[in-house]
């Protein structure tokens, strides 16, 4: 052909999932094609101008630890950085950044265009080429056929997307973009379960029409945090403040008086919306006892006058949106630049996926992002990286890889989706992870970078930085273990000055650091224990590892017990009707979910410990009891 049409991996869609998938496959050396309906919207932040948050920031750090793009792009585009839960334990601390939309998109596009093995082509995809239950390519709107060994679908909200503003609606993938109708129809012909979900976005406000003098500013942290393990604060652009306002009784009255004009309450929208990011009309009705709700006014960029009012996502008519906005303090004369809206779209049941995000029914077809029922840039990007990695491995006839629940929030995310499925847009929280003390933001690289290197995702620069950090931490911990003081040491007085009670017996540096009144900075400021590490990441890691060592050891013991079940594999084609002793309900659920391991089966709602015992005995009798390495 006069144009390249043979690839290892094709990625369909250029949002947060698609861009990470494309970068991952290409980093592994696979010839990769990224098909997008518009090159100018690669990495577009379709909703809020922010990255990270509780649970979400953990995913971003994991993406970064595996060589991904999101954290690096955020460091180049972030205009305000904060550590959430900074006063709490390290397991729930999370980084969040406001991002300049234009700079973020530029950072993503620049990375894609400079990635070897990756070709970008602008054309909507209308069909998949499927032969003998295996995907072998894609067909674009103009009839171009591209063939590949694996295909990754990362189409966001575009599949048969329908936008709602009041009682009016029209087809669209998001505001200003067409939907993907033909591809939606094609996917519905495949043996995959499909349903509808809904999400929404608030109106955007002209900053020049806001009276900021009436509002409370919210500043970023000092010193300014960074997202990437390779990042530094010097990469950040100019920093900006957010501002806070509140809804009030007048706001709520406007909403209650116009519920008959809401497509949700009028029954026009059938898709279920996100529980943890509800529309303002939902909040007012669900929390009727609340007199006000906090609204964050977030700048969309350094060169933009648009403000994103985080907390008033709505699909009410435009005139009602104007009343809502102008009912709030500081916004009395505000002007809306873009109306808020809700969007309904197709998603496919993630229980039809393997933990690698490959379809159980169409070989070589991978799904990532909102098509799997998730919500959020971070959740999409994490899935994209995993799907791109596994598409690359599939194309090279290698076994797939997926992290366990005790290894990564990405493991929790994929296990929740592929085991339990979802009936509403799924978002990540730290509370979803049972081993969250092990899954901290600060140790994402220690958990995943070595694996990423083996998988071909981590380049030489990141590997050298990581190796140096590991060596620093190990040497510093050994140094502290080797320094001893006793009650009659020459410098004991400066140590006693920091302690609640004078030193009564000999102790080394690590034992002193375990005391609640001592932190690493204080300890290394003492003559006997200095100098401190200059790298703040390594210094933090030393303190956390020492102070939480007992808790971490106990959690590791719990994990090792659970791994026995996780590593006990179940045959993919097992018909559970054959297993005598299981109830009809358990048989139906196991046949429906098709779990890949005993551990996964045990997390399905309604699968009892007794059922697991019966299953284990049956597997042993049949000679099918196998454990993964």
Swiss-Prot record:
Homodimer. Heterotetramer of two MnmE and two MnmG subunits. NAD(+) binds at residues 273-287. The lineage of its organism: Bacteria, Pseudomonadati, Pseudomonadota, Gammaproteobacteria, Enterobacterales. GO terms for biological process: tRNA methylation; tRNA wobble uridine modification. Gene3D superfamilies: FAD/NAD(P)-binding domain, GidA associated domain, C-terminal subdomain, tRNA uridine 5-carboxymethylaminomethyl modification enzyme MnmG/GidA. NAD-binding protein involved in the addition of a carboxymethylaminomethyl (cmnm) group at the wobble position (U34) of certain tRNAs, forming tRNA-cmnm(5)s(2)U34. Keywords: Cytoplasm, FAD, Flavoprotein, NAD, tRNA processing. Belongs to the MnmG family. Its cofactor is FAD. One of its GO terms (cellular component) is cytosol. InterPro entries: FAD/NAD-bd_sf, GIDA_C_N, MnmG, MnmG-rel, MnmG-rel_CS, MnmG_C, MnmG_C_subdom, MnmG_C_subdom_sf. SUPFAM superfamilies: FAD/NAD(P)-binding domain (SSF51905). NCBIfam families: mnmG_gidA. It is found in: Cytoplasm. FAD binds at residues 13-18, 125, 180, 370. Pfam families: GIDA, GIDA_C_1st, SAM_GIDA_C. One of its GO terms (molecular function) is flavin adenine dinucleotide binding. This is tRNA uridine 5-carboxymethylaminomethyl modification enzyme MnmG.
């Amino acid at each position: 052909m006069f144009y390249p049409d043979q690839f290892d991996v094709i990625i369909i869609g250029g949002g947060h999932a698609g861009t990470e998938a494309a970068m991952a496959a290409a980093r592994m050396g696979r010839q990769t094609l990224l098909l997008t309906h518009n090159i100018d919207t690669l990495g577009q932040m379709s909703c809020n101008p922010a990255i990270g948050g509780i649970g979400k920031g953990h995913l971003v750090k994991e993406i970064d630890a595996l060589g991904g793009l999101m954290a690096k792009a955020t460091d180049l585009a972030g205009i305000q950085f904060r550590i959430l839960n900074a006063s709490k334990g390290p397991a729930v601390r999370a980084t969040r950044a406001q991002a300049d939309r234009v700079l973020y998109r530029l950072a993503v596009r620049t990375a894609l265009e400079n990635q070897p093995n990756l070709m970008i082509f602008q054309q909507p995809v209308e069909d998949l080429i499927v032969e003998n239950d295996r995907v072998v390519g894609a067909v674009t709107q103009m009839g171009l056929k591209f063939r590949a060994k694996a295909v990754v679908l990362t189409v966001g909200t575009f599949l048969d997307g329908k936008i709602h503003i009041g009682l009016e609606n029209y087809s669209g993938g998001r505001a200003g973009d067409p939907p993907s109708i033909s591809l939606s129809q094609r996917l519905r012909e495949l043996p995959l379960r499909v349903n509808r979900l809904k999400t929404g976005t608030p109106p955007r406000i002209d900053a020049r029409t806001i009276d900021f003098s009436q509002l409370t500013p919210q500043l970023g942290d000092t010193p300014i945090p960074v997202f990437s393990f390779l990042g530094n604060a010097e990469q950040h652009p100019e920093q900006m403040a957010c501002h806070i306002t509140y809804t009030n009784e007048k706001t709520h009255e406007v909403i209650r008086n116009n519920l008959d004009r809401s497509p949700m309450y009028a029954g026009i929208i059938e898709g279920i919306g996100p529980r943890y990011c509800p529309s303002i009309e939902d909040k007012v009705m669900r929390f009727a006892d609340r007199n006000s709700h906090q609204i964050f006014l977030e700048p969309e960029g350094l060169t933009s006058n648009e403000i994103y009012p985080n907390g008033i996502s709505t699909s009410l008519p435009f005139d009602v949106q104007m009343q809502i906005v102008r009912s709030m303090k500081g916004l009395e004369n505000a002007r809306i630049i873009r109306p808020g809206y809700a969007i309904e779209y197709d998603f496919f049941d993630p229980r039809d996926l393997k933990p690698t995000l490959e379809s159980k029914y169409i070989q070589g077809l991978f799904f990532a992002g909102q098509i799997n029922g998730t919500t959020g840039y971070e959740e999409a990007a994490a899935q994209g990286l995993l799907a791109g990695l596994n598409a690359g491995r599939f194309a090279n006839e290698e076994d797939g890889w997926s992290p366990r629940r005790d290894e990564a929030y990405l493991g929790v995310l994929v296990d929740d989706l592929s085991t339990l499925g979802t009936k509403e847009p799924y978002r990540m929280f730290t509370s979803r992870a049972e081993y969250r003390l092990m899954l901290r933001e600060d140790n994402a690289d220690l958990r995943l970078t070595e694996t990423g290197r083996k998988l071909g995702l981590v380049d030489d620069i990141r590997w050298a930085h990581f190796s140096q950090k590991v060596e620093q931490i190990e040497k510093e911990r050994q140094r502290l273990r080797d320094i001893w003081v006793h009650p009659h040491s020459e410098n004991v007085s400066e140590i006693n000055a920091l302690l609640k009670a004078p030193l009564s017996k000999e102790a080394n540096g690590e034992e002193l650091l375990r005391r609640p009144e001592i932190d690493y900075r204080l300890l290394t400021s003492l003559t006997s224990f200095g100098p401190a590490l200059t790298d703040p990441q390594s210094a933090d890691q030393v303190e956390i590892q020492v102070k939480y060592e007992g808790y971490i050891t106990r959690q590791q013991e719990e994990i090792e017990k659970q791994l026995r079940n996780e590593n006990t594999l179940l045959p993919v084609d097992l018909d559970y009707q054959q297993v005598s002793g299981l109830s009809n309900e358990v048989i139906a659920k196991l046949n429906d979910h098709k779990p890949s391991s005993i551990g996964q089966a045990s997390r399905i709602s309604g699968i009892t410990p007794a059922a697991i015992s019966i299953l284990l005995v049956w597997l042993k009798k049949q000679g099918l009891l196998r454990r993964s390495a």
